[in-house]
Amino acid sequence: MVTINTALCKNSTRVMILGSGELGKEIAIECQRLGIEVISVDSYSNAPAMHVSHRHHVIDMLNPKEIKRCINLEHPDFIVPEIEAISTNALIELEKNGYNIVPSAKTIHITMNRKLIRVLVSKKLNILTSEYQFASSFDELKIKTKVIGYPCLIKPIMSSSGKGQSVIYNEKELRHSWEKSQTYGRTSLGEVIIEKIIPFDFEITLLVVNSVDGMHFCLPIGHRQEKGDYQESWQPHKMDNVIFEKAKKISKKIVSYLGGYGIFGVEFFIYKDKVIFSEISPRPHDTGMVTLISQNLSEFALHVRSFLKLPIGKIRQYGPSSSVVICGNELYGNKISFSNIECINTNQQIRIFSKPNIKGYRRLGVILDQDETIERSLRKAKKTASKILIKT
């Protein structure tokens, strides 16, 4: 029997969210709907999830001492990482001391490190990936890129949202790419992964829910990125059912090995009849924002239900839906305002993230849309997003 103790009472059920961005905000809202006490944590003040939490803390998320101090102060029942920039060694130690890490400290540790997850998937689980090499110095990078060939993609082994990544076409670009990876990676580990750029027809995110009543799959989500950063997504993505079943089978194999209750976002490249593994996130995925309008249970509701050990049942998808980001570009300041919001059409919704400032470019919200076809839905959502006026 699952018991939830009311927030702010002496015996309250507490969830601590490590990372308080727009994804953490939606997780916090789902917890609030269930009367759970929410504590959000991030490295900066006034992060989105902090607006809808009972309490918050601002700490260095990569400092294991600060992570442990914060958690031992609050004694949460569930610790829910929402970002990559976290001391995973601290989480492993905390789990050994009895804390419940979602989905598990081992899973967080493996999936936040591109080297660990790529070797696991390709070598241990024998799943198809793009060709890759690793390098921990500039001299080694020069050698390994010759093995992979040009063009290739260079990424820090720990980063997200395209940070520190670059596509290089010749040896002259190596120095800049290496320096970028060292500057913008999430930690100072220094190591990078070099990936062969492969042809593909499209890429998808497959949301997989591991729960007490089995493993559940959302319909495939298509998405478009720029410089590794999500711009728009849609559900369902049209694809051959045989290929979809193959993606589900691969996802199940990976998630079953990793273990733990929660939602996983598995990214694939699809080329002809090949399903090629790209990455996996053990938490709600930014491309999954579309599920706020496309499903009876969003990815955030699914995540919370699963780690609380509540049954998921049947996930219903409502038809062609899309999500398009509202971006601030070449803007600076901490007084962000949005106008012309009344341009939103029927069957559309808006989410404004409430990020406290902007320094050049930043995702600040999304337009959610439903229509008879994906093409119509995307077209409408992009048109509406372009009409939202942002000032600082």
From Swiss-Prot:
Binding site for ATP: R114, K155, S160, S161, G162, K163, G164, Q165, E195, K196, I197, I198, E203
Pathway(s) this gene product operates in, as recorded in its UniProt entry: Purine metabolism; IMP biosynthesis via de novo pathway; N(2)-formyl-N(1)-(5-phospho-D-ribosyl)glycinamide from N(1)-(5-phospho-D-ribosyl)glycinamide (formate route): step 1/1
Enzyme nomenclature, EC number: 6.3.1.21
GO BP of this protein: 'de novo' IMP biosynthetic process
Pfam family, one: ATP-grasp
GO MF assignments: ATP binding; magnesium ion binding; phosphoribosylglycinamide formyltransferase 2 activity; phosphoribosylglycinamide formyltransferase activity
Catalysed reactions listed for this entry: N(1)-(5-phospho-beta-D-ribosyl)glycinamide + formate + ATP = N(2)-formyl-N(1)-(5-phospho-beta-D-ribosyl)glycinamide + ADP + phosphate + H(+)
Keywords, sorted A to Z: ATP-binding, Ligase, Magnesium, Metal-binding, Nucleotide-binding, Purine biosynthesis
Gene Ontology annotations for the cellular component aspect, listed alphabetically: cytosol
SUPFAM superfamilies: Glutathione synthetase ATP-binding domain-like (SSF56059), PreATP-grasp domain (SSF52440)
Annotated positions binding N(1)-(5-phospho-beta-D-ribosyl)glycinamide: E22, L23, E82, D286, K355, R362, R363
Ligand binding (Mg(2+)): E267, E279
Keyword Cell membrane belongs to the record: no
Domain ATP-grasp: 119-308
NCBIfam families given in the database record: PRK09288.1, purT
Subunit field text: Homodimer.
UniProt family annotation: Belongs to the PurK/PurT family.
Main function: Involved in the de novo purine biosynthesis. Catalyzes the transfer of formate to 5-phospho-ribosyl-glycinamide (GAR), producing 5-phospho-ribosyl-N-formylglycinamide (FGAR). Formate is provided by PurU via hydrolysis of 10-formyl-tetrahydrofolate.
Protein name (record): Formate-dependent phosphoribosylglycinamide formyltransferase
Originating organism: Wigglesworthia glossinidia brevipalpis
This protein's encoding gene: purT
